[in-house]
Amino acid sequence: MTYLAPALARIHPDWEAVLDQAAVAARLAEIDRLLVLQQQDGKTLFPPPPQVFNALAFAAPADVKVVILGQDPYHGDGEAMGLSFSVPDGARVPPSLRNIYKELAADLGLGVPASGDLTHWAQQGVLLLNSVLTVERDKAGSHGKLGWQTVSDALIDAVNRDNPGCVFLLWGNWAQTKAERIDASRHLVLTAAHPSPLSASRGFHGCRHFSQVNAWLIARGRQPVRWATAPAAQSCLF
């Protein structure tokens, strides 16, 4: 590996066996080759190479509490950081995340965080996973055909198989196609419209997923997620 080597060096060791599966490893090698070629052509790719597998840096598959699936990284400068829906501290909060925060506030009565950095969720076992893990600058969906789905599906399968019970939040039609990979007899699967401004009013707002997640975890003897640990300052969102 060349382009992906810095990112692979940062993952939790329990994910290594998943990425070492023959089909997954072969796909990763091909993705790595294509990313190197794009980089050599002068294309700017996001997220930065060390952050491509940021979602896998915090918890083993067996320790994940919640999976929040995204589609592909943000394609603007200074936005993508390897966690679905998350942006670095100081970056403008994107519209979909703004709606996630609004629902979080309405559901739990908490203040709206000023920062769009969701690292504090990841540190508690929230797997913020995009299906496609890279993108070319200013070209949404540009890496959708590189084969990343083989990799991300294997990661979902590992959580489904190895985790004693977690919650999958499937927001939007695309994420809901992954429901067939999840054993709903062991895991809780919650679905809603995507938080994008185009669809949030059609079933995302009012879904109360955050309180449902914690009630389910507590009932099974697991620690709830501290959804709001960053300073709240709603005026910073707009």
Curated annotation (Swiss-Prot):
Assigned GO CC terms: cytoplasm
GO biological processes: base-excision repair, AP site formation via deaminated base removal
Primary subcellular site in the record, as a coarse category: cytoplasm
Top enzyme category: hydrolase
Function, as annotated: Excises uracil residues from the DNA which can arise as a result of misincorporation of dUMP residues by DNA polymerase or due to deamination of cytosine.
GO MF term set: uracil DNA N-glycosylase activity
Catalytic residue positions: 72 (proton acceptor)
Lineage summary: Bacteria, Pseudomonadati, Pseudomonadota, Betaproteobacteria, Neisseriales
Family to which the UniProt record says this protein belongs: Belongs to the uracil-DNA glycosylase (UDG) superfamily. UNG family.
UniProt-listed SMART domains: UDG, UreE_C
Reactions listed under catalytic activity: Hydrolyzes single-stranded DNA or mismatched double-stranded DNA and polynucleotides, releasing free uracil
Entry EC number(s): 3.2.2.27
Protein name: Uracil-DNA glycosylase
PROSITE patterns from the UniProt entry: U_DNA_GLYCOSYLASE
Key word Nucleus present: no
Hydrolase recorded as keyword: yes
Record's keyword terms, sorted: Cytoplasm, DNA damage, DNA repair, Hydrolase
Subcellular location per the Swiss-Prot or TrEMBL entry: Cytoplasm
Species, as recorded: Chromobacterium violaceum (strain ATCC 12472 / DSM 30191 / JCM 1249 / CCUG 213 / NBRC 12614 / NCIMB 9131 / NCTC 9757 / MK)
